[in-house]
Amino acid sequence: MNNNNSFNFIDSQYSTPQGAYYDNTGRMGGGGGMGGPTDSFDNELPLLEELGINFDHIRSKTLSVLNPLKKIDSHIMDDTDLGGPILFGLLLGFSLLMSGKIQFGYIYGLGLIGCVSMYIVLNLMSEKGIDIYRVISVLGYCLLPMIFLSFTSLIININGMVGYILIGFAIVWSTYSASKMFVKVLSMIDQRILVAYPVGLLYTGFALITAF
């Protein structure tokens, strides 16, 4: 009699809980309304989204820079995306490194001064205001023409007439794209020239680092 009670006790300890089941992977799931640990994992955001890296946003903003004549959505900078600017900054430094120029310090130093300066200028000029992260995002994405210029310098010598034309084109391209984004986001259409002037000075500095 005691042996039967012992076996019943052991069986109750190791049996499947009421309302539970085992799926085809061998994991136990609950049959009730309470969500188990697997439910919390399923509801978690992907790691890249938690880090603020969204490849769809990077692609759309990159295409906006590549085609500056295309109409820009006023909500393009609603999200604070720094993944693209960091990537483009590293690409610019890598391309300069391939040409024998170790300019990472100059790139990030000029970028820091330029972003802080533009943040101050834009907040003084606009009624809406803008945060520093969106300034970094816009200026970082618009580095793309400078990256093209830097990789072009690996193929041809840009310290000549053709090179000067390419340098001027890259500066105008970057300045046009960045100023267009700023005035669209901040509703400053009438002040575009005033916005483009400091932006152009910043990208001229990047072009000089790239060329010399």
Curated annotation (Swiss-Prot):
Keywords: Endoplasmic reticulum, ER-Golgi transport, Golgi apparatus, Membrane, Protein transport, Transmembrane, Transmembrane helix, Transport. Residues 101, 150-163 are lumenal. It comes from the Eukaryota. It is found in: Endoplasmic reticulum membrane; Golgi apparatus, cis-Golgi network membrane. The keyword Transmembrane helix applies. GO terms for cellular component: endoplasmic reticulum membrane; trans-Golgi network. InterPro entries: Yip1/4-like (IPR045231), Yip1_dom (IPR006977). One of its GO terms (biological process) is vesicle fusion with Golgi apparatus. The chain crosses the membrane at residues 80-100, 102-122, 129-149, 164-186, 192-212. It is a multi-pass membrane protein. Pfam families: Yip1. Disulfide bonds: none annotated. Residues 1-79, 123-128, 187-191 are cytoplasmic. Belongs to the YIP1 family. Plays a role in transport between endoplasmic reticulum and Golgi. PANTHER family: GOLGI MEMBRANE PROTEIN YIP1, PROTEIN YIPF. This is Protein YIPF5 homolog. The lineage of its organism: Eukaryota, Amoebozoa, Evosea, Eumycetozoa, Dictyostelia.
